[in-house]
């Protein structure tokens, strides 16, 4: 009978990060998956990252996770979303060669120290009570009846838990096209009274590249040079390709409307789908006034003829999907290689978890990924690494756990949202969910988290050394900029007008002004030109060379955000102090500027009595709470003024 310190069930994005993290910490770890050949499979879109999501990938990488390095080896179209806006909303995103990404993940996982991979399915657990009457994991039981002893299990079932695929009226028990669902495991969770719910998601049809008329479509070129995700990647080496844009039209919508009754969404109305990644059926129904919807045609690989039409996820019958596709510009002759479909699956109420992602009902059992009601590769990876870390620390019987907080990471925001608010629809990360988003950006994940990982022996010496070199270089540059001064009068000769107070400003002070950048500083102090080129090597590795290019950017971003961070902290202090503020029962939320229709709808329906209660409602962001508080305070001030 085999025994392992940690057993991870599931080889998707959550499972791979959990297994790698547990193994990095030195535990004897087993990863059990249905098929070794599907480890690292990108089940839906062939891309990693995005707004908020890209920050999570950087955070996972800062903790020595594997997703960032894998996508850097597979990236064929890279962009920084929102690059024209502030760094707090930058969203690194990379289109992947699907085969290369899976190959990269498998090469990493199958050669990882302390990690064994087994092709099998888990149907049950052996759970016993300890001396304190607590239920504890003792073993996993496979479909072949084998008992594998362990005290720590991380369950990452994705969409496989009682999974059912829908294509029109046709239904097939499956967690992913071509893969069996996990039925017995769902029964096991029911047996131990876990609160299970049902969610669904979907995917679009895949198209044949050679049957698309690319010449009449709008080309979308990626960034040049492409920016890597991992702090250990010097540069992207894969050839870069373009994506293309087309649109649905009135005829497309007519075809969809006439067949809505045949879509899975018509008979799965009680199973909630992702609000922020809706199917084309939902778009046509919900936004009836729109004459078109955008579609991104994304290549799935350099030597792959498959194209992913991002924006038309659906569960219509195959013949309707064909008719719909041929109504779209550029796709008149397009052939479908695989139809789109919806998949429904079980999830557990994440409020049954601690912030470590250990279950409250069974000691030693952890959940990560879509089983917790989330959607997205990145959200899964972020949960997986935290669950794997805590399972390993607990296996060593260490008293401390590893918990990230809302103040230090998007992973912390996500997990706190899940375990305190729960979910009523597939959860997706957004910058609006993070009250400290000005501080937890994509550019500083290593400076926020790598030290935390190193302190528990999770992070390699190589990564830690790169960080230390980077921090020292940032410090040196800030000191240099702090030593260069100029008066407001002198600045006017360079066309810069600031407060005429006679006080000398340092170069670092000037960087905080929105209209002053590195180019302007070099004009004032030409000696800074040599600094920005960084001709001297910063360290001893290629990763050091990557990091040195980020030094000037890091210093400028920190300078620009400093006054806003002070204001952000003041807002959060205001929020903490006003948590018991009462909200009138007849309060009209639509009068509050900046609230989304989703937030207004939920608050008008629930009618929370206090700010504290409103804050706990799923989907209500900290920014929304601050806006309501400011409105209430201003209204109170106006009322008081009328009595003066």
Swiss-Prot record:
One of its GO terms (biological process) is tRNA wobble uridine modification. InterPro entries: FAD/NAD-bd_sf, GIDA_C_N, MnmG, MnmG-rel, MnmG-rel_CS, MnmG_C, MnmG_C_subdom, MnmG_C_subdom_sf. It is found in: Cytoplasm. GO terms for cellular component: cytosol. Its cofactor is FAD. GO terms for molecular function: flavin adenine dinucleotide binding. Transmembrane segments: none annotated. NAD(+) binds at residues 273-287. It comes from the Bacteria. FAD binds at residues 10-15. NAD-binding protein involved in the addition of a carboxymethylaminomethyl (cmnm) group at the wobble position (U34) of certain tRNAs, forming tRNA-cmnm(5)s(2)U34. Belongs to the MnmG family. This is tRNA uridine 5-carboxymethylaminomethyl modification enzyme MnmG. It comes from Wolbachia sp. subsp. Drosophila simulans (strain wRi).
